[in-house]
Amino acid sequence: MGALDDCLIQGDRYLPLDYKTRGYPVKEETPSYYQNQLNIYTLLLQENGREPAGCAYLVFYHPLEQNDGSRITFHMHPVKMDTDPERAREIFRKAVVLLSKRSCPPADGECGFCEWATRVGPIVSA
């Protein structure tokens, strides 16, 4: 997640727009991976006095072909997504609570990061 790529203005409402470049066509579940990012952009717009429209756009690009060795043709796939700034606010609240604790929470068997940390921990500390 970085800075907002673009912002559409519809009347007095603001719609975040984020560009994504991939090496392959968008899979059905891919847009959902960016839900938190779009919710956070919406919250930041709201907190800065801009009325969010309640939705945002992801625009995915992937290469179709390379012409003449120097020109690449891309396919564009826009996806409209509903946004909820209150879900972003809740993420921030939970982060503050977690960061204020003196120790890390116990590992969760379903957490990919916990699994990774368990595997690399011995390597890193060696």
What are these regions (language model features)?
Residues 34-46:
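An active-site-proximal "capping" alpha-helix that borders the catalytic cofactor pocket
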Residues 44-126:
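Metal-dependent nuclease catalytic regions and adjoining charged, substrate-binding loops involved
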Residues 28-32:
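Short, solvent-exposed loop/turn segments at secondary-structure boundaries
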Residues 2-26, 41:
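Conserved catalytic cores of phosphodiester-cleaving nucleases, focusing on short active-site segments
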Residues 23-27, 74-77:
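A short, mixed-charge helix-start or loop-turn motif at secondary-structure junctions
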